[in-house]
Amino acid sequence: MPFAHEQLNLVASEQLSKTETIKLRNQHIGQACQLFYRSDPLKIVRGQGQYMFDEEGTRYLDCINNVAHVGHCHPEVVRAGALQMATISTNNRFLHDELVQCARTLTSKMPEPLSVCFFVNSGSEANDLALRLARNFTKRQDVITLDHAYHGHLQSVMEVSPYKFNQPGGEAKPDYVHVAPCPDVYGGKFTDKMYPDADMGALYAQPIEEICQKQLAKGQGVAAFIAESLQSCGGQILPPAGYFQAVYDAVRSAGGVCIADEVQVGFGRVGSHYWAFETQNVIPDIVCVAKPMGNGHPVGAVVTTPEIAQAFHATGVAYFNTYGGNPVSCAIANAVMRVIEEEGLQQKALVLGDYLLEECNRLKQEFECIGDVRGAGLFVGIELVQDRKERIPDKKAAHWVVNRMKQLHRVLVSSDGPNDNVIKLKPPMCFNRENADEFLLGFRECLTAVMQERLASATSAAMAATSGVIATATETLANKTKLFERQDRLIKSV
């Protein structure tokens, strides 16, 4: 199939050499802006579907780019954006159909009473606005967040992102932010190993219930609880059953509202539902969406209830976002949602996700370096460990696998989690069975190499230990021989 720019008769701009690109980046881009594969970064010049191509034409299978939700440069999405850009793009203070059609389609996917939209340009902006809505509605300040959470790069959302503020050099957490344990039943504060018979959802909800009770005792309550429906940076975490129901009840009893951050996991990725929060049978008060919504184009939205939206309007301060809800962004978002429906991508994510989980669990039975496999749809995490019984994370192996998958197998994956030992899979939704098998084949080779290296290290250590024992025994024997010789000389001298 021709690339999208070829279908539209567009001519790609002339490329710099990779060396020149790196040189200019080092000169003009802040060093805090990190790259994948920093020792040998990829220069990507084209994309198509689930594939990306470097400057030499090498094709890579993309297993991490949930930004390109329906596939890189999907022709219908590209066409919709190009057509609207060639027609008109302006701010949303003028009437235009793409905005209202986008809002209608987006809210039609939401449960009642989530029916009012505010459009933004990114997940960070969406979460920032969600906190504003919550604090305005409740007239409170305090926010509960989860450990290892990441909600964006703006100051307001960095404050509720332990993934960032707990790093070396991170700013201290404000007193009005309360951090509860991430509901990770494999490697978190409470594990299914420690509490094999416990209700893990209730157990992890308890710290939040205690925070709410303390806030009420002080006469303050809380403004909001914010959480990703499935935590991504925390290591592809699926909360235990009943967790969000118990948490939402506690937060609302303390006067707060519940914010679902769907920036990473929304728009059908989990397969069983359009939104990941639906897997827990809860209805948030505010939902934040972005990233996959624009398939690589900057667009996002906050969806909330008429009551919360009206309270925001009642302040008398108009909300205006120059690019939020512009015609081009909305045309692209509309095209993305059409493609999800027309190509049945949600159902495909369900079927393929089940296949990936099943096959990764087969690998777990074969390779001791896999501690846990978890996921929903095309959101999968594979936790690598040094010791399965003790669940000791293996960050070194995870990094080695990520780089070997790229260099040898031309498959792009990443690692994350508090110990950076979880292999993450979040591919474009056009990912297919053949792609899954390609990943599995390369991953198997990497795991085989990891285990062979461990065996070699263990054998080497055992040989070194044996050599040490032999050397010690030899030295002891020599010492005893010398002792006997001295005793013999003494006897003869007498």
Swiss-Prot record:
InterPro entries according to UniProt: Aminotrans_3, Aminotrans_3_PPA_site, PyrdxlP-dep_Trfase, PyrdxlP-dep_Trfase_major, PyrdxlP-dep_Trfase_small
EC number(s) per entry: 4.2.3.-
Key words of the record: Lyase, Pyridoxal phosphate
GO molecular function, one term: pyridoxal phosphate binding
Cofactor: pyridoxal 5'-phosphate
Origin: domain of life: Eukaryota
GO biological process, one term: response to nicotine
UniProt xrefs under Gene3D superfamilies: Aspartate Aminotransferase, domain 1, Type I PLP-dependent aspartate aminotransferase-like (Major domain)
Family per similarity comment: Belongs to the class-III pyridoxal-phosphate-dependent aminotransferase family.
Parts forming coiled coils: none
Identification of the protein by name: Alanine--glyoxylate aminotransferase 2-like
Keyword Lyase assigned: yes
Keyword Lyase in record: yes
Sites of N6-(pyridoxal phosphate)lysine modification: K291
Pfam family name, one: Aminotran_3
